[in-house]
Curated annotation (Swiss-Prot):
The gene is apaH. CDD domains: MPP_ApaH. GO terms for molecular function: bis(5'-nucleosyl)-tetraphosphatase (symmetrical) activity. It is an enzyme of class 3 (hydrolase). This is Bis(5'-nucleosyl)-tetraphosphatase, symmetrical. HAMAP family: ApaH. It holds the Pfam family Metallophos.
Amino acid sequence: MATYLIGDVHGCYDELIALLQQVEFTPDTDTLWLTGDLVARGPGSLDMLRYVKSLGNSVRLVLGNHDLHLLAVFAGISRNKPKDRLTPLLEAPDADELLNWLRRQPLLQVDEEKKLIMAHAGITPQWDLQTAKECARDVEAVLSSDSYPFFLDAMYGDMPNNWSPELSGLARLRFITNAFTRMRYCFPNGQLDMYSKASPENAPAPLKPWFAIPGPVSEAYSIAFGHWASLEGKGTPEGIYALDTGCCWGGELTCLRWEDKQYFVQPSNRQMDMGEGEAVNA
């Protein structure tokens, strides 16, 4: 009964299956955690969603910014870009079923027994765990409702970038979405910076990676996240696990077996390009 945590797949379905075969993943007894961004860039987004959906209770996933963008394309709000390679998924006979399932997936996973949390981009140091849970539920409730296109149309944007319990309406939902799915850097007070994508050693002062700023969640729980491929899984404090290693850019797909903290990797089938590219609101 093992727990396997895997970074952003981005439609690299063949690499995912090869990695799961490598670790001898058994859905009947094991659990698979996925950091989000299941789709886009790689050629297998349709197969990816079909497979993950078929796993039922054997998978625990969180939504990433590319998953939300796919939902916006599906709702007719955003444009389908050829480089995202989403057309086979959008035109599939089971597209409605798959995407309505996808929009009902969470932004946050918490395992109290393991003291383990997963979110696509991480957890802002401005939140305690109760706030993070409440904020995740706010967005999840809208996404799973009939009014989800209205939210998706308003989610794009960088402001507000500072948390306050007084935030309400679409401004509150946009901050929550950015914190869970787009965050990389923060100011020392925890305020989000939505612009810098430099590597941590080249980040302009006073910005710091979100995980370098102490917060109540990171002090009590381990946190697994994806989103930040240029970290290459390195440079995080103890208990913080960066799992996106850029498979869709030609890097690797990385898996962490939680019980013994052993890593496994599957090389990408694509040519190396570790740049972040033109990610969606990334």
